Amino acid sequence: MPLSVGQGYFTSSISSEKFNAIKESARLPELSLWEKIKAYFFTTHHAEALECIFNLYHHQELNLTPVQVRGAYIKLRALASQGCKEQFIIESQEHADKLIIKDDNGENILSIEVECHPEAFGLAKEINKSHPKPKNISLGDITRLVFFGDSLSDSLGRMFEKTHHILPSYGQYFGGRFTNGFTWTEFLSSPHFLGKEMLNFAEGGSTSASYSCFNCIGDFVSNTDRQVASYTPSHQDLAIFLLGANDYMTLHKDNVIMVVEQQIDDIEKIISGGVNNVLVMGIPDLSLTPYGKHSDEKRKLKDESIAHNALLKTNVEELKEKYPQHKICYYETADAFKVIMEAASNIGYDTENPYTHHGYVHVPGAKDPQLDICPQYVFNDLVHPTQEVHHCFAIMLESFIAHHYSTE
């Protein structure tokens, strides 16, 4: 079969004949009786997939923008079964992209051209200008990027899987990620950036510190200790840590020392296990998120962000003295986000409000809006940035890593 949608045992196939019928039809196809029965008892996303295919074939008649067309293509890829995702190929050209879906034999079953909108991803273009790509990056024997983090770094949808595809399930979140596309971890490890294998333990909701069983949320979510316990250290890894925001924003903890010390203890564990390269990242200024700006705890969030980063940086300096043969660096995430926010403001992006106020959960029976992959907003929701901001962050971080970990 050309395309299978759904996951695990709950899959549904879309034949090449169905593709052709959708292409020739002026109306959105209806589900067959058997397809309706499967959709009723199992979540196959068959109807959503057919709608995406219809929108792709008929984007001109529907007056869809290039962003909406790309959104339909990305959503269809997210709905496709795991073994079919390699059938989706984007061929980039000078003024347009060709969006392709192939069958099992490598033949095109869908191929459309979409122009590159000059205003799309304007923020990423600005950051690219100020942070030109480093040339001839050589990271020595580093072959893997290993990530420990929370929803900012969760590229595998770990919280999505843990909550049985509930958090986040709203249409403005892509493939179980807490953003409207890809995360900075995926960009950074991709062939267009550092081109390294990615090993990602990050999970949405994760905290830096461990909390007692008397705290139900603390018991449910992951933390640095649990993530590190799942990891087998290697001297060929660059271990990257970005945690702490949920301790202050989600669990409303204020023991900065406990939050930082837990992270440092776990960093020492992997160093003892053989890791030679570590990058420790501070948290963004939590008071600058739409949630923080309108919260009664705005000042508290700002103070905690500053205190956390100052203490974390001091501890990293102590680690560098304790392990002089290792490459251990601290990255000021808050400064990077300030640069991105300023650039966004200068070109007219909304830096104050979230793109969506809906929340994380899809309401059964409701029709979610089309996924927008590049709105001119810094924040996709009240606390999480858009994928474009993730891309900008990866651009800046690539320059930092090239400068501090390169062997040339």
Curated annotation (Swiss-Prot):
Disrupted-gene phenotype: Mutants have reduced cholesterol esterification activity as well as reduced lipid droplets.
PANTHER family cross-referenced by the UniProt entry: GDSL LIPASE_ACYLHYDROLASE, PUTATIVE (AFU_ORTHOLOGUE AFUA_2G00510)-RELATED, ZINC FINGER FYVE DOMAIN CONTAINING PROTEIN
UniProt GO cellular component terms: extracellular region; host cell endosome; host cell membrane
Subunit structure: Interacts with RhoA and indirectly with SifA.
UniProt subcellular location: Secreted; Host cytoplasm
Domain of life: Bacteria
Stated role: Effector proteins function to alter host cell physiology and promote bacterial survival in host tissues. This protein is required for endosomal tubulation and negatively regulates the formation of Salmonella-induced filaments (Sifs) in epithelial cells. Has both deacylase and esterification activities in vitro, but esterification is probably the dominant activity in host cells. Significantly contributes to cholesterol esterification, which reduces cellular cholesterol in cells and abrogates the ability of SifA to associate with cholesterol and LAMP-1 vesicles.
Originating gene: sseJ
Consequence the record notes for mutating S151A: 5-fold decrease in deacylase activity. Does not affect translocation by T3SS and cellular localization
Coiled coil spans: none
Disulfide bonds: none
Induction record: Very highly expressed in host macrophages and when grown in an acidic environment; repressed by H-NS and induced by SsrB.
Protein species of origin: Salmonella typhimurium (strain LT2 / SGSC1412 / ATCC 700720)
Positions of the catalytic residues: S151 (nucleophile), D381, H384
InterPro entries in the record: GDSL (IPR001087), SGNH_hydro_sf (IPR036514), Sif (IPR010637)
Name of the protein: Secreted effector protein SseJ
Family the UniProt entry places it in: Belongs to the 'GDSL' lipolytic enzyme family.
Assigned EC number: 3.-.-.-
